[in-house]
Regions:
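The feature captures the beta-strand-to-loop junction immediately N-terminal to the Walker
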Residues: 34-36
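Helix-to-loop junction immediately C-terminal to a conserved catalytic motif
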Residues: 49
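Conserved ABC transporter NBD signature motif
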Residues: 57-68, 77
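Conserved ABC ATPase "signature" region
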Residues: 113-131
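Conserved ABC ATPase signature
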Residues: 135-139, 143
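Catalytic Walker B motif of ABC-type/P-loop ATPase nucleotide-binding domains
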Residues: 160-163
Length: 277
């Protein structure tokens, strides 16, 4: 994904929701866009999928999987991009789980025999095959998100956008969904663009983008971003617990090796350090 000089202003506003931002997402990578509520994150998701069209600017480029987004290529882009939204109930259209997953395939005139094979395969991938005859409204929040993900997988996207898709789940449910997404990414060679205000979720990414008031403040690895406390504060975000503790230890002149990059590794390292004292 390549984005250049992207801006967007809603009709009822004089202030751009997205203001001249540029970034790229490497194929097969996991990139997370972070920012507080109202920073423009969800607007960017809708611009990438062609749900919204950017302000008219000859310098603006949105390129997904080698296709530049225009009014003529909008549907080609949408075939390559799937969005999992915050509330899966808003995405359900089928009476049963299998009907809902098949909906996108029906719109693409996929044959019934092929459709059945695809639905079976994607439900198996998200561990929801036993619920294929169930009504979506009776599923748990995590199960609903799994079905929503299956519906996206069915159309064979190159890019999956997670738009605050775990924000309504408890910590355990959130961890399971993120682990599932990572497994699916590795299995299917997917590119993941995660949009969140949850800093702990952002740690999983290879690349982070920090957005504030529609402007891109910084991009880099999670390590590079989280070690910049001034940047995090200016964006109105909080550091994950690991980086809070690590930064305080560094201030006290306690050396923390680069390979210590998680809470588990930090606890182990400090225990080893303590045993040597």
């Amino acid at each position: 994904v390549t984005v250049k000089h992207l801006s967007f202003t809603y009709k009822d506003s004089k202030v751009p929701a997205v203001n001249d931002i540029s970034f790229s997402i490497p194929r097969g990578s996991w990139t997370t866009l972070v920012g507080h509520n109202g920073s423009g994150k969800s607007t960017i998701a809708r611009l990438l999928d062609g749900i919204l069209l950017p302000n008219d600017n000859p310098r603006t480029v949105i390129n997904v999987d080698g296709i530049e987004l225009t009014e003529k290529t909008m549907w080609d882009i949408r075939d390559r991009v799937g969005i999992v939204f915050q509330n899966p109930d808003n995405q359900f259209v089928g009476a049963t789980v299998e009907d809902d997953v098949a909906f996108g395939l029906e719109n693409r005139q996929v044959s019934r025999s092929k459709m059945q094979t695809i639905v079976h395969d994607v439900l198996e991938q998200v561990d929801m095959l036993d619920f294929q005859k169930s009504e979506p409204q009776y599923l748990s929040g995590g199960q609903k998100q799994r079905v929503a993900i299956a519906g996206i997988l069915a159309i064979g996207p190159k890019l999956i956008i997670l738009d605050e898709s775990t924000s309504m789940l408890d910590p355990a449910g959130k961890a399971k969904i993120l682990s599932l997404i990572r497994d699916l990414q590795n299995k299917n060679g997917l590119t993941i663009f995660s949009i969140t205000h949850d800093i702990n979720e952002a740690v999983q990414a290879e690349q982070m983008l920090v957005l504030d008031k529609g402007k891109l403040l910084a991009s880099g690895s999670p390590r590079e971003i989280f070690e910049n406390e001034v940047l995090i504060k200016s964006a109105g975000l909080e550091l994950p617990l690991f980086y809070k503790v690590k930064n305080e230890l560094i201030k006290k002149e306690i050396h923390i090796p680069r390979e210590v990059n998680s809470e588990e590794k930090l606890v182990k390292y400090l225990c080893q350090l303590n045993s040597k004292m």
